[in-house]
Amino acid sequence: RGNIACLMQRCKWRGIEAETIEFELKDEIDFAKLDIVLLGGGSDREQMIVCQKLKEIQKDFKAYVEDNGVVIAVCGGYQLLGNYYKTEDGVMEGLELVDIYTEQEEGRLIDNIVLQSELVAMPVVGFENHGGRTYIGENQPFGKVLYGSGNDGKSGYEGVVYKNVIGTYLHGPLLPKNPQVCDWLIARALERKYGEADL
């Protein structure tokens, strides 16, 4: 909720009219009416339920992403963006919106984390707590890890950026702690909708 509140407040301060739409499993989702999609996390079981629902509209979601739709996906939502998430119980197919994958490994990566991201001038800060290790291949990371573990505890990078999609393990909440990232999302949404953004 903190990420949503931050987006709404920073729009309000600039006189940008915005509304929040919360979707339940039974709801129809029309991506043509959405400017920013927030995909949060949950337990593995909850993720599986949500993923099954989103798989039904995967083609529409993929079209939204490829048309520069803005998405911020945190923790479990980040894992869902990819091709699959392998746990000790089996393999959960992802939404295949970004060419990444996640595998559960022994031990959790828990700590404060600091990144340097190409998207914003200031360092990005947050808190990470994840058992999954995400591998992003040749994709652009959200940032280089200055302190903490990041995607897999080895690569030195955290998160992924694809077009106007950010996937990340950073809690905090992310956007209130990093208003520049919040403004980046708003600016991309305005550019997509109106062709320009003056923040």
Q: What do these predicted ranges mean?
A:
Residues 1-66, 176-199:
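N-terminal beta1-alpha1 cap of cysteine-dependent amidohydrolase-like domains
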Residues 104-199:
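Amide-donor transfer/coupling interface in amidating biosynthetic enzymes
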Residues 36-40, 72, 167-169:
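Structural motif
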Residues 24, 99-101, 128-130:
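Residues at the C-termini of beta-strands that transition into short coil/loop
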Residues 26-31, 103-104, 134:
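A short acidic, often aromatic-flanked loop/helix-cap motif at beta-alpha or helix-coil junctions
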Residues 44-117, 121:
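Cysteine-nucleophile active-site neighborhood
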Residues 22, 77-79, 101, 134, ...:
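Catalytic metal-binding/acid-base residues of hydrolase active sites
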